[in-house]
Amino acid sequence: MLFRSLKYIYTEHGYNKDPELTNYWFNINKKYNYNNEHAHPFSIFSAVLYVKVPKDSGNIVFRRPDVAYHYTRPDVNNSRNYLSYWLEAEPNLFVVFPSYLFHSVSQNLTDEKDDERISIAFNFA
């Protein structure tokens, strides 16, 4: 199911190849941990699967990759003209995005005793 969905994404973005999983890793963010803004070079698409997400343990934040926003500021901000866009992490949420898209993970500020946010990140060529 996952690779069928990824194949659809590849095709829709003009790639005539099967997705190839190149690497993956686990992220364990304890209270006050966060991930600085970064991208994933040498990949076409990246993804994250949230496994364990305590309340207020941080969201993934994507930054608009172009500078148009700085020159043509809209009167109303919405999901089509954002400078940054965040998704609230929740268990079993699987997010696929272009690897060039800069993103970060906000600070884990949970008050839950079991405070670790756990996710699995993937890169596909």
Indicate residue ranges for each PLM-predicted region.
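Short beta-strand-to-coil "C-cap" segments at the C-terminal boundary of structured domains/repeats
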Residues: 123-125
